[in-house]
Amino acid sequence: MPRKGSVPKRDVLPDPIHNSKLVTKLINKIMLDGKRGTAQRILYSAFDLVEQRSGRDALEVFEEAINNIMPVLEVKARRVGGSNYQVPVEVRPERRTTLGLRWLVNYARLRGEKTMEDRLANEILDAANNTGGAVKKREDTHKMAEANKAFAHYRW
């Protein structure tokens, strides 16, 4: 932790094509080894595929997908009297979007399609339809929080 006060949050610039900060954050999640150009090409190609396959605006479909992925509750480990409890806590809004984007990219990478554009496009379409790996991850997270509801009074 810094000794001299808090470090200011860095603001992300909206992407040039869709003028959306969420798209920039997704590009940053896709990017490997600082190759932003490659990440942008992958995302914009995936958006083209989404538009072709759904017949709707890609940004609309993407935002719907992210809303379907973002978790409301998660569990955090809390040590009480020598034993660890999984305590359900609400997820902060910023962390919700971060987790949603992270899960979207991770589950897209695990898919079997040939190119990353295909994988990402299909994962976005699946998430918009409330199916796919990322949505399953959110459901599992919510189930875990529901199962550990009894420990909610240990919240801090």
From Swiss-Prot:
Domain of life of the organism encoding this protein: Bacteria
Alphabetic keyword roster: Ribonucleoprotein, Ribosomal protein, RNA-binding, rRNA-binding, tRNA-binding
Record's GO cellular component terms: cytosolic small ribosomal subunit; ribosome
Pfam families membership: Ribosomal_S7
Keyword Endoplasmic reticulum: no
A GO BP entry: translation
InterPro entries: Ribosomal_uS7 (IPR000235), Ribosomal_uS7_bac/org-type (IPR005717), Ribosomal_uS7_CS (IPR020606), Ribosomal_uS7_dom (IPR023798), Ribosomal_uS7_dom_sf (IPR036823)
GO molecular function: mRNA binding; rRNA binding; structural constituent of ribosome; tRNA binding
Function: One of the primary rRNA binding proteins, it binds directly to 16S rRNA where it nucleates assembly of the head domain of the 30S subunit. Is located at the subunit interface close to the decoding center, probably blocks exit of the E-site tRNA.
Similarity remark: Belongs to the universal ribosomal protein uS7 family.
Record note on quaternary structure: Part of the 30S ribosomal subunit. Contacts proteins S9 and S11.
Protein name from the UniProt record: Small ribosomal subunit protein uS7
Species name: Staphylococcus aureus (strain NCTC 8325 / PS 47)
Organismal lineage: Bacteria, Bacillati, Bacillota, Bacilli, Bacillales
Gene expressing this chain: rpsG
